[in-house]
A protein has these predicted regions:
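Basic, Lys/Arg-enriched alpha-helical interface segments
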Residues: 1-60
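Short acidic-hydrophobic surface loop/beta-edge motif
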Residues: 62-64
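Enriched for short, Lys/Arg-rich terminal
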Residues: 66-94
Length: 94
């Protein structure tokens, strides 16, 4: 089974998204994050589910789309994935 690790940057991104959504509704923010984690957990069985990030064209750097967010991750090995960013799709990815 594949282990999924969250980088500090991805964790900070997720916290910012949660904080933003929770200004309107803590309940919706909780649900959003729970559903996001469920989406990420699908990578344990299907690590190549996401598309290659077009800006970088590296086979190991991929993304899942969740709502308006790009969940950018890197396949480190057959047993390890790192979540790199939780990035709003309207913003440029650097």
């Amino acid at each position: 089974m594949i282990s999924i690790f969250w980088t500090q940057l991805a964790s900070e991104d997720l916290q910012e998204v949660y904080d933003y959504i929770s200004r309107d509704s803590i309940q919706y923010a909780d649900r959003f994050v729970d559903n996001l984690f469920e989406r990420v957990d699908t990578l344990e069985k299907f690590p190549r589910l996401g598309r290659v990030v077009p800006e970088f064209a590296s086979e190991s750097l991929r993304e899942l789309i969740y709502g308006n967010y790009r969940l950018v991750y890197e396949i480190i090995s057959e047993t390890e994935i790192h979540m790199i960013r939780v990035h709003h799709s309207a913003r440029l990815l650097k």
